[in-house]
Structures are given as C-alpha cells and as structure tokens.
Regions:
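Acyl-donor (CoA/ACP) binding surface of acyl/acetyltransferases
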Residues: 1-25, 57-153
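Short, P/G- and charge-enriched loop/turn segments at secondary-structure junctions
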Residues: 45-48, 134
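Conserved GNAT-fold acetyl-CoA-binding loop/helix
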Residues: 26-46
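Short loop/turn motifs at secondary-structure junctions and domain boundaries
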Residues: 48-54
Length: 153
C-alpha cells in the first residue's frame, strides 16, 4: 500500500521535528550543512523562514506524521527551493511525490536549487521533477550543483 503524502502549512509543533531531522548525522553529512543549536535554529525558522511573507513554506506529512519541509525563497532576483526530509522517508518515492505537489503550489519560474555536490539523492530528486543542472557554484568551502526548472533551463 502506498503512503499518503500531503503538504500543509507549518505549525509550531513541526519545528522540533525539523530540528531533530537537521541533527541526523547522515543527513548533515550528505548536505554538508552543520546542525544548529536549538535556539539558533528556532530563531532562524521563526524570523527568517516563517517570518518572511515572501517565503512559501510547507510541511510534508506522510500517513499523518511530519516527515519534513519544503521552502521557497528569494535570493536577489532568483527564486530558490530547499527541503529537508527525515531519514525514515528517504528512498521511498516520498520526496518525489512531495516535491511534485510543492511545485504545483509554488508556481514561480524559473526556480532554482543548489544541493551540495555529492548529495546524489537530492540531485536525482530534482532531476526527476524536471530540474536541469546548469553548472556549479561555491558556498564557502563546498561546491554545489546549480539546477533550474523553467525558463532559462
């Protein structure tokens, strides 16, 4: 039986799970994203993610359980997306179904994503949903694959 995958607005109770997912050692290694301390994480989410009306933020719910999130935001004149799924939801097609649903709601195009080079699962997910790799960019010490969906791809 296929899992139910839905999107909904973020509720305050989701943030503790998002923090726990960020602290998963394998997820941190794959993303090369250093987990933040609880207070820094909560402040970032409340002020920068949820506090910016230009952002579009959705919680991924699988069979009634909070599985992760998708976020769209502006960086200068480019609209980016990012996401985080708990490890229990990897490799089961959940990311593909959730991203497909998110892209139906987030209609800005072109839309960009830049997972770290080596995060092949994330690159594959984006490509399955129509993103095309256009090159690489550096963020600090890490090289990232720049992918785009829509015009300019």
């Amino acid at each position: 039986m296929e899992n139910s995958v839905q999107l909904r607005d973020v509720v305050p109770e989701d943030l503790e799970l998002f923090l726990a997912y960020e602290h998963d050692p394998d997820a941190a290694r794959r993303s090369r994203f250093a987990p933040r301390e609880s207070e820094a994480f909560m402040t970032h989410w409340r002020t920068r993610v949820l506090g910016d009306p230009a952002n579009f933020v959705q919680t991924v719910v699988v069979d009634g359980e909070t599985a992760g999130n998708f976020v769209a935001w502006w960086e200068e004149d480019r609209r980016f997306i990012g996401y985080w799924l708990g490890r229990a939801y990897w490799g089961r097609g959940i990311g593909t179904r959730a991203l497909t649903a998110f892209l139906e709601r987030e209609t800005a195009r072109p839309l960009y994503a830049d997972p770290v080079v080596g995060n092949t699962g994330s690159v594959r997910l984006l490509e399955k949903c129509g993103f095309t790799a256009t090159g690489t960019v550096r963020h600090g010490e890490n090289e990232h694959v720049l992918l785009v969906l829509g015009e300019g791809a």
